[in-house]
């Protein structure tokens, strides 16, 4: 008799032209991810082959009970690392039945920014460093920490190896490989300064694809931690006190920045970001004031400053960029729970479209 694992791993392509499409969307909190699956005829090679779908928005905090239908528009497809075969993950955004984006649909406005001719011409690249914390399920305390207690102070844990320094590497590696399988442009992982905290990087990816990939990478991480019985936290300061917070540093460049003379373009872009500091901070994640204190490799939330190789700055420029006169900059302000559609779109809008009055 087949066991559960055998059934889960059934290869449907041997007996059917049907595949499973897992539709994913951002829920009512603006940070939670929801998904449900449907059967479609495969293989699917382009998102235009997929039908729209709907869900009960009153159960996700996105619609009233008396008019609860929200429509899912498929926007990007990825290979499914859990079901494998020709099965797919589908990143969607959400609309009313009348075709209006609902308030939590931040992709719609980002897509407008990224389709603007001035933005398209500059081919914006993003590299997003997603930090996160793994928590023990029943006590909501970081993985590897004694329950109700604390490990030794920070110092030995960053990029470390060893049972007393690195906690959850099997989860991190499983996620890494699953993202590569899915077709996400994941460029690396590392252990972070606080024990139980890790980071993965997505990019360089162009425009809105970077944000789609971060959301799907988060979804895959939620699924991996679900299997492992561990809780994923994107809280920007999960443990108060002398512990690093969690951010989503966003590296950015345009065609002009990557060409000779690009360093001057970078400096002009940073000047614009300085003028809109408050607007960016307001959009860069909930609870970020607990993280951006001027300590633990952050700039104070109320102060904008930039520097070369300065990890205590709002914007950091790398030594190589300064030396070569071209390259990219890193916006260190976004929190780990930021919406990548909002952050990527806002950086492009401020640096490429915004005009000072």
UniProtKB/Swiss-Prot annotation:
Top-tier EC class: ligase
Molecular function terms from GO: ATP binding; glutamine synthetase activity
Pfam families: Gln-synt_C, Gln-synt_N
Keyword Cytoplasm: yes
Induction: Induced in roots by ammonium supply.
Similarity comment text for this entry: Belongs to the glutamine synthetase family.
Function in brief: High-affinity glutamine synthetase involved in ammonium assimilation. Plays an important role in the primary assimilation of ammonium taken up by roots. Plays a role in maintaining nitrogen metabolic balance during ammonium assimilation, thus controlling plant growth and development. Reassimilates ammonium generated during lignification within developing tillers, which is probably required for the outgrowth of axillary buds. Required for nitrogen-dependent biosynthesis of cytokinin. Active cytokinin in axillary bud meristem is required for axillary bud outgrowth and necessary for tillering.
The protein, known as: Glutamine synthetase cytosolic isozyme 1-2
Highest classification ranks of the organism: Eukaryota, Viridiplantae, Streptophyta, Embryophyta, Tracheophyta
């Amino acid at each position: 008799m087949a066991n559960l694992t055998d059934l889960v791993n059934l290869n449907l392509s041997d007996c059917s032209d049907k595949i499973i499409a897992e539709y994913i969307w951002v829920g009512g909190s603006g940070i939670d991810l929801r998904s449900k699956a449907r059967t479609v005829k495969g293989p699917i090679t382009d998102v235009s082959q997929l039908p729209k779908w709907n869900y009960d928005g009153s159960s996700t905090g996105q619609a009233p009970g008396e008019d609860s239908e929200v429509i899912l528009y498929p926007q990007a497809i990825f290979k499914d690392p859990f079901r494998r075969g020709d099965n797919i993950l589908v990143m969607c955004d959400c609309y009313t039945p009348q075709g209006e984006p609902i308030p939590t649909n931040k992709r719609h406005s980002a897509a407008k920014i990224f389709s603007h001719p001035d933005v398209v011409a500059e081919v914006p690249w993003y590299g997003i460093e997603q930090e996160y914390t793994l928590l023990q399920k029943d006590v909501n305390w970081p993985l590897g920490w004694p329950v109700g207690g604390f490990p030794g102070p920070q110092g030995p844990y960053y990029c470390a190896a060893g049972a007393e320094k690195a906690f959850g590497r099997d989860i991190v590696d499983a996620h890494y490989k699953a993202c590569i399988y899915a077709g996400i442009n994941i460029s690396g992982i590392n252990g972070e300064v606080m024990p139980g905290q890790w980071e993965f990087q997505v990019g360089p990816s162009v425009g809105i694809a970077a944000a789609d990939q971060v959301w799907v990478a988060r979804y895959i991480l939620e699924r991996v931690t679900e299997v492992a019985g561990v809780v994923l936290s994107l809280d920007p300061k999960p443990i108060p006190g002398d512990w690093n917070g969690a951010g989503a540093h966003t590296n950015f460049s345009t065609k002009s920045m990557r060409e000779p003379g690009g360093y001057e373009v970078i400096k002009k872009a940073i000047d614009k970001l300085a003028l809109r500091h408050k607007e960016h901070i307001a959009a860069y994640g909930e609870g970020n004031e607990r993280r951006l204190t001027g300590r633990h490799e952050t700039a104070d939330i109320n102060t904008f400053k930039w520097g070369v190789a300065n990890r205590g700055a709002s914007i950091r420029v790398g030594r190589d960029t300064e030396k070569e006169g071209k390259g990219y900059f890193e916006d260190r302000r976004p929190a780990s729970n930021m919406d990548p559609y909002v952050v990527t779109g806002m950086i492009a809008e401020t640096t490429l479209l915004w005009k000072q009055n």
